[in-house]
Amino acid sequence: AKKMKMNRKLYYILHSGKNSKLRYYITSYLWISMPHCLLSWFRKTIISKAQHGNDWDEITKRVEYYNKLHRSEIDLPAFQQKAIKLSEQKKTGQSVYYLDAFRYAKSFPLHRKWWLQPGDVTWIPDIPAIVKSRPIKGNNANSVLLKLDRVRHFLFVNDRLKFTEKADKVVFRGLIGQFDSNTLKQNRYSFVKKFFGNPRFNIGVIDKGFNEWSTEKMTIREHLSYKFIMALEGNDVASNLKWIMSSNSIAVMPHPTYETWFMEGTLIPDYHYIEVKADYSDLEAKIDYYINHPDEAQSIINHAHEYVDRFRNPQRECIISMLVLDKYFRTTQ
């Protein structure tokens, strides 16, 4: 059994299907090691060119969504006191936040000030901050979204299986405890408790300490042999939502409460994903419905693919990121 477990771990490491961290770190450090003058020239050139492109409306719409700041609503003295100059920005504890934000910020004058808030941000800061995530509800203007921790969150797949070729089951693999405390991710815990052992579900928990539910991790490819994949929020958003929506399986989840660069707040229930109640009481009925109505299931998959396509153009993603920061610096100075 021990040998099988070791083999399984090795198989997962080699076939997880996740983004290569080595490649990510090499390209990120190359990007931020470029001279400031070169990055500044690149930013001005690429934005000037984009203004005459046919997707300028889409670009500006997304910039306004990520950055909702209005100068009149900002506590400027508090911002000036708390924010730091780009030239003084130290590397964050988890370097991905620094690398993903600074690759764009370095193209601006380095005396500009900002407040970079790393990690899973589930509250709204009291001054304008650059964040990965924010609550969908409430006045969230101070939470300015950038594409942070991209190596973990932004992953799309090429799914070779059609929806009709997949198993009529729901799959879930994930953590149900918080890595930094003894509390539980209550929504995930409730789901596992309710459905573990149900033959229509393949459920496993990857934390230690939940022996009755504990299983090995599954590769993305293994997830994709199921029609329905649970996308349950963890510390903030469900990090698997992007790759599920790029596949021929369907994301199943309650209404999201947090959003990131993926604009989860704009997703339409039962159009981009299957929405279930927060207590999961309608989950089995909804799964039955879409098993029996494969055309409607396929429509959701098609809409999800259209949605994901908006995020697939690397040049446009770069332009939007730079414009989000441009508005941030203009509004807060």
Regions found by a protein language model. Name each.
Residues 156-158, 214-218, 238-239, 260:
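A generic local structural motif
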Residues 120-123, 175-179, 208-212, 235-237, ...:
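Short, solvent-exposed loop/turn segments at secondary-structure junctions
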Residues 129-134, 214-222:
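Charged, often glycine-rich, active-site loop that binds/positions anionic groups
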Residues 155, 211-216, 269-271, 288-290:
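Active-site-adjacent structural elements in folded domains
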Residues 145-157, 213-214, 225-226, 232-235:
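A Trp-anchored, charged/polar loop motif used as the substrate-binding/catalytic surface
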Residues 221-333:
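Catalytic binding pocket for nucleotide-activated donors in carbohydrate/polymer assembly enzymes
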Residues 194-219, 272-274, 278:
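Extended, non-globular alpha-helical segments
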Residues 2-209:
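Secretory-pathway glycan-assembly enzymes, especially type II membrane glycosyltransferases
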